[in-house]
Design a protein with these regions (language model features):
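A cross-kingdom feature marking solvent-exposed beta-strand/loop segments within repeated
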Residues: 2-5, 9-11, 33-39, 43-45, ...
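N-terminal beta-strand motif that seeds the catalytic metal site of vicinal oxygen chelate
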Residues: 1-24, 81-90, 140-143
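Generic structural signal for individual residues within well-ordered alpha-helical segments
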Residues: 24, 39, 94-97
Length: 143
C-alpha cells in the first residue's frame, strides 16, 4: 500500500479533445471554467490547458493532439473525445513508483518524464489499475 503522506490528492482529470480552442470555449460557456495554464508539450505531442475547478485545487486538463502520432490522437481515433486519465498528486514520485513496482504494477516510463508546469509524471498501465490510465504527478518545486 502507498503511505498516506505520499499520495495526497486528486490532481486532475484529463480529457482528450480534438480541438483545444473549441473545448476551452465549451467549458467556459457551459461551466464557467477558464484556463489557468496552457502549454505545448512536444515530447508528449499535446497542446494542453488546465482549468481550475473553484478553489478546490483540482483541475480539468484538456489535451489536444499536436500530430497524428501522439498518444492523444490515437486515443481519440480509438475512443473519441472523453476522459483519458485520472491523475493523483504525489509528494515523491520515485517512492510511489518503487512501491507500485514492488506490488507488480507496470509503469509506462522507466523514469518520470516532464509534465505540465515542469512537474514529474509517470503513468500506471490501465491493465494494472482497474482499466483506468492513472497518472502520478509530483508538482515542480519552487526554486
Amino acid at each position: 500500500m502507498i503511505p498516506k503522506h505520499l499520495l495526497i490528492a486528486i490532481d486532475h482529470v484529463g480529457i482528450a479533445v480534438p480541438d483545444l480552442d473549441d473545448a476551452l470555449e465549451f467549458y467556459a460557456s457551459t461551466f464557467g471554467l477558464h484556463s489557468i495554464h496552457e502549454e505545448v508539450n512536444e515530447e508528449q505531442g499535446v497542446r494542453e490547458a488546465m482549468l481550475a475547478v473553484g478553489d478546490s485545487g483540482q483541475c480539468i486538463q484538456l489535451l489536444a493532439p499536436l500530430n497524428e502520432e501522439s498518444t492523444i490522437a490515437k486515443f481519440l481515433a480509438r475512443n473519441g473525445q472523453g476522459i483519458q486519465q485520472l491523475a493523483y498528486r504525489v509528494t515523491d514520485i520515485d517512492a510511489v513508483s518503487a512501491t507500485l513496482r514492488e506490488r507488480g504494477a507496470r509503469l509506462l516510463y522507466d523514469v518520470p518524464k516532464r509534465g505540465t508546469s515542469n512537474s514529474r509524471v509517470n503513468f500506471v498501465h490501465p491493465k494494472d489499475a482497474g482499466g483506468v490510465l492513472v497518472e502520478l504527478v509530483e508538482p515542480a518545486t519552487a526554486d
